[in-house]
Amino acid sequence: MSDYLSVSSLTKYLKLKFDRDPYLERVYLTGQVSNFRRRPNHQYFSLKDEKAVIQATMWSGIYRKLGFELEEGMKINVIGRVQLYEPSGSYSIIIEKAEPDGIGALAVQFEQLKKKLAEAGYFDDRHKQRLSQFVKKIGVVTSPSGAVIRDIITTVSRRFPGVDILLFPTKVQGEGAAQEVADNIRLANERTDLDLLIVGRGGGSIEDLWAFNEEIVVQAIFESHLPIISSVGHETDTTLADFAADRRAATPTAAAELATPVTKADLLAFLKERQMRSYQAVMRLIRQKDEQVKKLQRSVIFRQPERLYDAYVQKLDHLRTHLLTKVRQVYDVYDSKEHLLRQRLLSFNLSGCIQRYQAQLKQDQRLLLSHMSSQYDSKLARFEKAQDALLSLDTTRIVARGYAIVQKDNHIIQSTQQIKKGDRLHLEMKDGQVQVEVENVKQEENI
């Protein structure tokens, strides 16, 4: 019986071989991920090819540092060690490092994070803010020693001198760069004197630009209440920060141009044009009003002011005739009633009653005539008042009071500014006309 090994003895022997074999301590393996189901801590799945399958284990610390998400069917390259699990007698590979086969891990991580953030709405156009036409102060999150800040300062100074630039010195690559970029974006948003923010750096490899692909940077840009222009790398480089920013510029110079869409020269030209338009509009209005005044001066009302009250005279005559007619009609009615009552009373031989009715009738007649007379006097007084007001506008009456109408070239003169020394004037007085020549013009300053 001593020639037979127990299962546990054989398994222990094989495990010892596995653990001591240098070829199994560091194995480079290519396979396709199978039976993958994400777990909170350690990850357990299989690697397979067309002919075989091996179990794989990835501890939580390795998985968190992976940089991309494992997916079912993904082909990956792994480095690890092979070990034997004694209770089941099965072997597996303990993965210490992994990356996608064919493309880099950063590229996969980029696409996976891009998809995640896009689904969360971080890149939606509805969240984009409009850039202001005119800015007073621009914040810049970039390295203080790079060419980016120099290009921005040069371009802004050329396009719109007087715009202030506030630099937030920032580490733009390497460990801690992403956190510093995000912190400075939030710091800029705490200020109230900035109009917009430029976030960027110069060109480099995907590793150099990676800070601008980190989720914390994208989130800081998305949450910014300041409009943000991204300028990361060269024109061919695209980062997740570019997708989240309100505008993307290919170069720092282009970013500065976007930040100052209207140059100082453009603004001065615009103001000059508006000034000219305003002047022309005012002059047109003056000419229109002047033409209206001249048209009024040539109207019949000013040449024949008596026409202003002709209609009132006619209306008064009509009212007088109408009133007299009404008085006669009322009087005739009462006279007829009186005659009828007298006849009726006489037929009854009621002399006392007749006398009372006669007295009442005479009183009613007096009241009626008094009321009618009062109405007539009131309307006549209103007419005479209106007539006097209109007659006061009659130029012949004005002249009759000792005034004169002064004309030059058949136009009435209203101001000393309309005449000058040597002008010949025509004066119309109540008893004749006079031709005079101006020897001196004195203008009153307070008029």
From Swiss-Prot:
<keyword id="KW-0963">Cytoplasm</keyword>
<keyword id="KW-0378">Hydrolase</keyword>
<comment type="subunit">
    <text>Heterooligomer composed of large and small subunits.</text>
</comment>
<dbReference type="InterPro" id="IPR020579">
    <property type="entry name" value="Exonuc_VII_lsu_C"/>
</dbReference>
<dbReference type="InterPro" id="IPR003753">
    <property type="entry name" value="Exonuc_VII_L"/>
</dbReference>
<dbReference type="Pfam" id="PF02601">
    <property type="entry name" value="Exonuc_VII_L"/>
</dbReference>
<dbReference type="InterPro" id="IPR025824">
    <property type="entry name" value="OB-fold_nuc-bd_dom"/>
</dbReference>
<dbReference type="GO" id="GO:0005737">
    <property type="term" value="C:cytoplasm"/>
</dbReference>
<keyword id="KW-0269">Exonuclease</keyword>
<dbReference type="Pfam" id="PF13742">
    <property type="entry name" value="tRNA_anti_2"/>
</dbReference>
<keyword id="KW-0540">Nuclease</keyword>
<dbReference type="GO" id="GO:0006308">
    <property type="term" value="P:DNA catabolic process"/>
</dbReference>
<comment type="function">
    <text>Bidirectionally degrades single-stranded DNA into large acid-insoluble oligonucleotides, which are then degraded further into small acid-soluble oligonucleotides.</text>
</comment>
<dbReference type="GO" id="GO:0009318">
    <property type="term" value="C:exodeoxyribonuclease VII complex"/>
</dbReference>
<protein>
    <recommendedName>
        <fullName>Exodeoxyribonuclease 7 large subunit</fullName>
        <ecNumber>3.1.11.6</ecNumber>
    </recommendedName>
</protein>
<dbReference type="GO" id="GO:0008855">
    <property type="term" value="F:exodeoxyribonuclease VII activity"/>
</dbReference>
<dbReference type="GO" id="GO:0003676">
    <property type="term" value="F:nucleic acid binding"/>
</dbReference>
<comment type="similarity">
    <text>Belongs to the XseA family.</text>
</comment>
